């Protein structure tokens, strides 16, 4: 088990996003190339390479404007792996081309939870999710990696506490894809869940890719800052997100044009998120997003969990 975990762990070091990306690309280049070749083979067989490139063409200028950290990291990965930048942009938009090809998809996908203590040292206790995908299209998971992003210590004259350095973080992902879920050094946890269905809108060539959003969210110092940013940027496809730092949690469902969220404690901007419904005297608030129901949620009253689930 230790050997398996060591093989999955990659450390990306550097004082800038570009340097960290270059370090990551060099360390994981064989896995990145293997996954890229696999995905090209899959989408070529589906006759979808041209459509994939259309999605890349739409995403690239949006990344320049809205996700500069992630784009710089991606460029560094390309350099470190000795690959073309376009290949890494393709991997960054893999989820969007996969959704494009699936058409109307419903049910299944990931499940997650968070626990927030309300009394006796209140604060978020845990946030997490599973990754519920078809292993067959991801090399049976053997390429998946845990990435530790590390910046050098701040200098003595760094009065900001960060000095423009990237926040340290640990994240799970497929090699070459910016992020799937993670936790940064400010204690911000980022998770996401599928909510797309036949009635949902998509903007796959006019919005930021999901895995790019996830990586950029991990550059923010708080759940509040991350949620406000996520609401402000163009989003390619519908998703649900759970964001939590040590004192505040957000549960979000959004499409390219619509936004619904709850938060505890609620933000001053009530348009960003409404308060969660709490039981008087409760010591814990538990939120979850479930795509695999084992009970009839319409008939179990208010105890089924979060209303966004």
Language model regions located:
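C-terminal, well-structured catalytic/ligand-binding subdomain of enzymes
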Residues: 1-81, 117-309
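Gly/Pro-rich turn-and-neighbor structural signature
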Residues: 79, 83-128
């Amino acid at each position: 088990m230790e050997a398996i975990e060591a093989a999955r762990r990659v450390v990306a070091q550097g004082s800038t996003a570009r340097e960290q990306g270059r370090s990551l690309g060099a360390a994981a280049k064989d896995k990145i190339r293997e996954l890229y070749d696999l995905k090209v083979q899959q989408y070529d067989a589906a006759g979808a390479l041209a459509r994939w490139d259309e999605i890349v063409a739409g995403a690239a200028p949006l990344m320049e404007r809205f996700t500069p950290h992630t784009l710089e990291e991606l460029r560094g990965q390309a350099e470190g792996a000795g690959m073309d930048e376009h290949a890494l942009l393709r991997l960054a938009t893999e989820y969007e081309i996969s959704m494009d090809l699936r058409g109307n998809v419903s049910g299944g996908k990931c499940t997650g939870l968070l626990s927030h203590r309300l009394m006796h040292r209140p604060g978020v206790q845990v946030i997490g999710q599973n990754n519920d995908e078809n292993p067959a299209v991801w090399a049976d998971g053997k390429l998946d990696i845990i990435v530790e992003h590390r910046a050098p210590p701040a200098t003595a004259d760094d009065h900001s506490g960060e000095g423009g350095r990237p926040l340290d973080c640990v994240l799970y992902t497929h090699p070459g894809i910016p992020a799937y879920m993670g936790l940064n050094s400010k204690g911000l946890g980022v998770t996401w869940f599928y909510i797309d269905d036949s009635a949902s809108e998509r903007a796959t060539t006019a919005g930021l890719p999901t895995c790019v959003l996830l990586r950029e969210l991990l550059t923010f110092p708080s759940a509040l800052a991350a949620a406000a940013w996520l609401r402000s940027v163009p989003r390619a496809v519908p998703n649900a997100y759970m964001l939590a730092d040590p004192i505040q949690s957000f549960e979000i469902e959004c499409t390219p044009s619509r936004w619904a969220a709850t938060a505890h404690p609620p933000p001053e901007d009530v348009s960003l998120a409404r308060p969660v419904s709490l039981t008087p005297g409760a010591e814990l608030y538990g939120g979850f997003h479930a795509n695999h129901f084992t009970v009839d949620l319409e008939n179990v009253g208010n105890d089924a969990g979060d209303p966004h689930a």
